């Protein structure tokens, strides 16, 4: 396998697989990897040929969090450098969370700290049975600050109180119960489960999926009031009037597959 720390592979269907490729350090991330991931997510988001993005890790781990050498350098750095560094992590997670295509976390093993944050920032997560998760920052005197918006959105504030404060590891089964992952499978079934999700996602309209992601962000946590009613009314009206919406409705009436399939 290439020694590049981040790999991007795209197939004819428009499925892009982004792989954190540092198996010797369990795919821990440093400033270089963070920059490469941000560029990958941003670039794939505007690539019209990309339909779906799958995020995974090389070897037996998904992502073991921050690289120890990088953490050591940051511990010796000043406040300004630390703030700038933390903002790059925030920007990476945000670029993944706001990527206007469906994203799948293919969790092939351990996901610690920032690794858990990457899982939470994906739309759908599938994990192997032996995967272990941990929001472990407090155990080394830190806080899970940059990942917190995504992890709290995934597991809720109540569960976050436990796992943010204890830093204890939890299993894939617990991650499923908490809502962090959607499906837990045997290691041998991981690729099949991801492929099944890909096939299901490819059946949807790409523009409607992008709109659906924006809609979730717009309505989550908001009270149902006149402004929200208008937002949702405009959303469906715009979708109906769009070329993709018209094609989808006509294909349904004609009992044929829409053009995007």
Q: What residue ranges belong to the model's regions?
A:
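Conserved CoA-thioester-binding segment of acyl-CoA-metabolizing enzymes
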Residues: 1-58, 94, 191
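Amphipathic alpha-helical segments at domain termini/boundaries
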Residues: 1-17, 21, 169-202, 210-220, ...
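Terminal peptide-recognition signature
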Residues: 18, 22, 36-37, 55, ...
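Catalytic-core regions built around general acid/base machinery
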Residues: 40, 88-99
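Glycine- (often His-adjacent) and acidic-residue-rich active-site loop
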Residues: 49, 57-93, 111, 223
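Short, active-site-adjacent cap segments at secondary-structure transitions
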Residues: 60-64, 111-113, 134, 216, ...
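Crotonase-fold acyl-CoA enzyme core
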Residues: 94-209, 242, 256
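Helix-loop "lid/cap" segments that line or gate small-molecule binding pockets
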Residues: 163-164, 215-219, 234-240
């Amino acid at each position: 396998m290439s020694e590049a720390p981040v790999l991007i592979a795209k197939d004819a269907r428009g499925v892009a697989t982004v792989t954190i490729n540092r198996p010797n350090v369990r795919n821990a991330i440093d400033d270089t990897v963070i920059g490469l991931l941000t560029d990958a997510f941003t670039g794939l988001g505007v690539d019209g040929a990309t339909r779906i993005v799958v995020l995974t890790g090389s070897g037996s781990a998904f992502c073991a969090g921050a690289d120890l050498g990088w953490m050591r350098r940051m511990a010796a750095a000043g406040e300004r450098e630390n703030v700038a560094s933390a903002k790059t992590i925030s920007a990476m997670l945000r670029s993944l969370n706001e990527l206007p295509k469906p994203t799948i976390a293919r969790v092939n093993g351990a996901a610690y700290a920032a690794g858990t944050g990457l899982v939470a920032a994906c739309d759908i997560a599938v994990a192997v049975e032996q995967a272990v998760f941990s929001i472990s920052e407090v155990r080394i005197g830190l806080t899970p600050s940059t990942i917190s918006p995504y992890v709290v959105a995934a597991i809720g504030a109540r569960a976050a109180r436990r796992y943010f404060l204890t830093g204890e590891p939890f299993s894939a089964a617990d991650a499923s119960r908490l809502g962090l992952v959607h499906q837990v499978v045997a290691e041998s079934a991981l690729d099949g489960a991801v492929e099944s999700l890909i096939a299901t996602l490819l059946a949807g309209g790409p523009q409607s999926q992008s709109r659906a992601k924006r809609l979730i962000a717009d309505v989550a946590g908001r009270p149902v009031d006149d402004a929200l009613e208008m937002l949702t009314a405009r959303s469906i009206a715009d979708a109906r009037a769009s070329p993709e919406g018209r094609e989808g409705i006509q294909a349904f009436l004609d009992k044929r597959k829409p053009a995007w399939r």
